[in-house]
Amino acid sequence: IINFFESRTDDMVGVITFSNSAMYVLPLTQNKEAIKAAVNATAGNALFQTNIGAGLTSSAALFSGIADTGSRAIILLSDGAGRIDAPTQQKIKDWFSRFQIGLYWIVLRQPGGISIFDENFVPRDEEQPPPQIELYEFFKTFRSPFKAYEAEDPKSLELAIQDINLKEKKPITYTERLPGKNYSFGLLLTAMGLASLLLCLKILEVKSFK
C-alpha cells in the first residue's frame, strides 16, 4: 500500500481508520513521509467492531472544500463488514455523488470465509444476509463509480492495488506559480533613453529661445 502511494507522486492522500468509530489520522496531503507514517500507524490491533458507516462519511468529508482537480477515490480496506442504518446509507450515497468520489472496496477475506461474489449464496430462512453481502449490495446502488476486490494474501492484495492504479489515470489539473522575470536592465535602458530624449528637447528649447 505504501509503495502504491509513493509511486503516485502528484496525488494527495488522507487516512481515516475506524473500528467502533472513525479516527482522523491524516488530512489530504502530498507529504510522502507523513503518508507513510500514517499507513504504518494503522498496523496495530483494533476493537472487535466495524463501523464502516463512520469510516466512509469521515473519508468523504476530507474532500469538502477541496477543488476537484483530478481523480477522487476512496480505497476502503477492511477485514470485516458492518451494517449501516438507512439514514447513514443515504448520507454516504449523497456525499459520494456530490463530491464525485469513486469507491474501491478491498475485502481482506479469511480463508474459507464467505465470498461477496458468490451468487449462489442463500442465507438461512428468516436470517439477514451476512454484513459483507449486504454491504456489497448497497455499494452497487451508488451513482458514483464502485468496484470491489477480495484479497486472501499479499499477492492478491497487490493485484487489487495494481488494478486501482491502472484505473485512476485521470489527468490532474494544478496551478503552478512561475518565478517572475527580471526586467530591471531593460527598464533602466528605457529610462536612460527617455532621459536622453528629454535632455535633447531641453537643449533645442534653449536654442530656440535664444
Description of each model-found segment:
Residues 15-20, 59, 70-91, 103-110, ...:
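DG-centered beta-turn motif at the end of beta-strands
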Residues 150-181:
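Juxtamembrane amphipathic/hinge helix adjacent to a transmembrane helix
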Residues 21-54, 138-142:
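Short, charged loop segments at secondary-structure junctions
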